[in-house]
């Protein structure tokens, strides 16, 4: 394997690749052609590991980025996805085909959907309609014999005594794991801590149906804090060094959105008006949605974490498990 050893911390001289230190590289996987929406991470070493594949159309982007970092088709040891949503694992089957020696690691509750994504794709089609093809493409199966599952805890061997320890972190999804690097202290948080916009340092919840659950989401934030990571690596998007403050903000934002959604529901508003009211009452918290914000940035924020999706998840949770008034 030709490694990227000796390159600057900013990464190799390739757009979309950023070196983060400790042989960790952020890869912009360019969901639907957007920049800075979905990140994958490559950990170089004796056993190179890719965390998150992005969507199916992102697979060639990932392959080319790994090639630029010296990782050839038979060099990648492991592909890990934090959960099976299409912006994180939609490309798992395609990337696995491009790197035929890599095992694919996923929480046990998501494994069957990687092996046979038909039901997942059908559900996504109902939500996104024709936009599914543009946003996510078609998820292809991952051979079942190449899938390794983790449960409450798990380990990915990175070689040389280095490892990723997985920790079950539901709340956003029932098949979600966080992963902490034993050397760098980086914690890969997937969507469990929400969506981060590096341009404005905004942090907003990601609470889609059908799996959102307030108590487990807050429990995952507490668990993440107990791991005492050095840095958070968001799939949307990038590294955040202020760990304690960011996890506290994440918990605060989730609780605020639940509170506002409850209030709108208490006023007997229909779904569309609930979404509009929650958007109105929360938007001033986010610089990306301010009156002077760049419209493209605002559109990117809404693509990453739409108000309608998050409110729908909270409404589903409220309806499924009625809360005390």
Task: Label each region the model flagged.
Residues 13-69, 73-75, 179-191:
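Conserved beta-strand hairpin/beta-sheet module of binuclear metal-dependent hydrolase folds
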Residues 49, 80, 104, 186-188, ...:
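Residue-level marker for buried hydrophobic side chains located in beta-strands
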Residues 5-6, 12, 55-57, 75-87, 113-170, 174-244:
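Metallo-beta-lactamase
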Residues 90-99:
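Metal-dependent catalytic neighborhoods of phosphoester/phosphodiester hydrolases
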Residues 215, 220-279:
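Active-site/pore-lining binding-face segments in mid-to-C-terminal subdomains
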Residues 2-4, 263-325:
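C-terminal regulatory/interaction regions
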């Amino acid at each position: 394997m030709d490694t990227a050893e000796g390159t600057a911390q900013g990464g190799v001289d390739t757009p979309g690749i950023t070196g983060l230190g400790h042989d960790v590289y952020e890869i912009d996987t360019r969901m639907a052609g957007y920049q800075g929406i979905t990140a994958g991470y490559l950990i170089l070493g004796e056993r190179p590991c890719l965390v998150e594949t992005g969507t199916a159309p992102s697979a060639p982007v990932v392959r080319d980025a790994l090639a630029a970092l010296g990782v050839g088709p038979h060099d990648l040891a492991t592909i890990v996805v934090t959960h099976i949503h299409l912006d994180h694992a939609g490309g798992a089957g395609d990337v696995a085909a491009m790197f035929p020696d890599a095992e694919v690691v996923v929480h046990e509750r998501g494994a069957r959907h990687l092996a046979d994504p038909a039901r997942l794709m059908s559900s996504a089609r109902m939500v996104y309609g024709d936009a599914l093809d543009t946003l996510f493409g078609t998820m292809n199966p991952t051979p079942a014999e190449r899938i390794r599952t983790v449960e409450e805890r798990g380990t990915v061997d990175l070689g040389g005594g280095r490892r990723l320890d997985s920790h079950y972190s539901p709340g956003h999804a029932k098949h979600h794991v966080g992963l902490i690097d034993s050397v760098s202290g980086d914690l890969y948080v997937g969507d469990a801590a929400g969506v981060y916009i590096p341009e404005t340092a905004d942090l907003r919840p990601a609470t889609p149906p059908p799996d959102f659950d307030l108590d487990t989401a807050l429990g995952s934030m507490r668990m993440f804090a107990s791991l005492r990571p050095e840095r958070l690596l968001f799939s949307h998007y990038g590294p955040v060094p202020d760990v304690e403050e960011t996890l506290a903000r994440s918990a605060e934002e989730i609780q605020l959105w639940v509170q506002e959604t409850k209030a709108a529901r208490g006023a007997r508003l229909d779904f569309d008006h609930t979404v509009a009211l929650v958007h109105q009452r929360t938007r001033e918290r986010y610089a990306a949605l301010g009156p002077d914000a760049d419209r493209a940035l605002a559109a990117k924020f809404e693509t990453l974490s739409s108000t309608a999706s998050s409110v729908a998840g909270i409404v589903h949770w409220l309806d499924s498990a009625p809360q005390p008034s």
